[in-house]
Swiss-Prot record:
Entry's EC annotation: 2.4.99.17
Organism: Bordetella parapertussis (strain 12822 / ATCC BAA-587 / NCTC 13253)
Disulfide bond as UniProt keyword: no
Gene that this polypeptide is encoded by: queA
Protein name: S-adenosylmethionine:tRNA ribosyltransferase-isomerase
Transmembrane portions of the chain: none
Record bears the keyword S-adenosyl-L-methionine: yes
Catalytic reactions on record: 7-aminomethyl-7-carbaguanosine(34) in tRNA + S-adenosyl-L-methionine = epoxyqueuosine(34) in tRNA + adenine + L-methionine + 2 H(+)
Amino acid sequence: MPTPLTLADFDYHLPPELIAQSPAAERGGSRLLHLDAASRLHDRRFPDLAGLLRPHDLLVFNDTRVIKARLTGQKATGGKVEVLVERITAPDRALAHVRASKSPGPGMRLRLAEAFEAEVLGREGELFDLRFPAPVLDLLDAHGATPLPPYITHAADATDERRYQTVYAREPGAVAAPTAGLHFDQPMLEQLAAQGVQRAFVTLHVGAGTFQPVRVQNLAEHIMHAEWYTVPEATVAAIARARAHGGRIVAVGTTSVRALESAAAQAQDGPLAAAQGDTRLFITPGYRYRIVDALLTNFHLPQSTLLMLVSALAGVAPIRRAYAHAVAERYRFFSYGDAMFIETPAP
């Protein structure tokens, strides 16, 4: 019996200077590390992806839109407070992370952005239930800031508002971008369509939990964060058409993987059907993928659930080798970094 994998199996050394602090000059200007079906590595540029895709392949994009979820302000006592909206639960209500010297209690009012007050209604685990005086999305659009990942050290600016968002984003609700999609510009999408590559969409609202480290050595003890997703009927039909024509299902990003495989899990042994709801799907090596044949993704944090997910698709050893190669070749890592195209290992 093989030794169970532990957190240490997903660690690697990353020089801090390889963490990309800003996007490439152009969306398609990144490098692309290609891990092919024979587990061979190829150094490419992102536009080379077009030559790796075939007619009838189906690209599945996550169309979530990053909201300006970060707010700063004061408690009634004058103490500073920072709010990160995690999930909008009603037009005027949201669950949020609240950072303050002392946690606010029910009934406390928070003065935010020097513009309005939000009332603390209660708490759900680590999140605070807040009531806003107007639609949450409207207030965030007017007064919020783009919530950049914790490893990006500068404050969000106008460039981040534009570039930390995919060109096809349309469903507001994410507090982190589905970063594999950041590499696509409109000309690239049009080129792929012209060569017969199909596209479909899912929605998964990426939460701040995507950046949380795994804190247990025994992976079976990890409690996965919940994220809301939907796989529409049109995407289910597109998957069936691609399969019928011999095309591959290529997930653009790990969030698309989670949505597709969550829908498959909901269908159990039946055919894939439209699905939506919260998912806590935790994909680790040994998981049997039911929908995804290939994956476009960025490079992920050491010891993260997303590194485990890609290792489940390609194998632990090939991913470890790919990451060592990426570090040696000075690829740029994480949200604003370079991309990786992973094809399912040949049987």
